[in-house]
Swiss-Prot record:
Signal peptide: none annotated. The keyword Plastid applies. This is Small ribosomal subunit protein uS12c. It comes from the Eukaryota. Its main location: plastid. PROSITE patterns: RIBOSOMAL_S12 (PS00055). The lineage of its organism: Eukaryota, Sar, Alveolata, Apicomplexa, Conoidasida. Pfam families: Ribosom_S12_S23. Keywords: Apicoplast, Plastid, Ribonucleoprotein, Ribosomal protein, RNA-binding, rRNA-binding, tRNA-binding. The gene is rps12. Belongs to the universal ribosomal protein uS12 family. It is found in: Plastid, Apicoplast. One of its GO terms (molecular function) is rRNA binding. GO terms for cellular component: apicoplast; small ribosomal subunit. GO terms for biological process: translation.
């Protein structure tokens, strides 16, 4: 136990809380797709972004973005998610990893293939 003078001299250091409690300091997490739907982005942009609701292996539910053109993900498929927000979709802080588990890669992709799970 510290005395009052010791506390004044060196105050207690706060532990930094990590923001991403859902991933729990893991780089990726596996989950089951519950629902696939579209969302519209923030003000200057206009599109229908494909998103999916996922129940993770720690029983928490999140909404993740499906990157790339076209997708072949359905309900009850397994998917691997990573952190990383989508700039024009508020509240979506996770992305699906294409080419892992039941999610197929982007077809006919020539550049940035590793990001979209496309083989050469």
């Amino acid at each position: 136990m510290l005395t009052f003078n010791q506390l004044i001299k060196n105050s207690r250091k706060k532990k930094n809380k990590f923001k991403n409690s859902i991933l729990n300091r893991c780089p990726q997490k596996k989950g089951i797709c519950l629902k696939v739907f579209t969302k519209s982005p923030k003000k200057p942009n206009s599109a229908l972004r494909k998103v999916v609701k996922i129940r993770l292996s720690n029983n928490k539910e999140i909404i993740a973005y499906i990157p790339g053109e076209g997708y072949a993900i359905q309900e009850h498929n397994y998917a691997l998610i990573k952190g990383g927000k989508v700039q024009d979709l508020p509240g979506i802080r996770y992305k699906i990893i294409r080419g892992a588990l039941n999610v197929s890669g982007v077809k006919n992709r020539k550049s940035s293939r590793s990001k979209y799970g496309t083989k050469k």
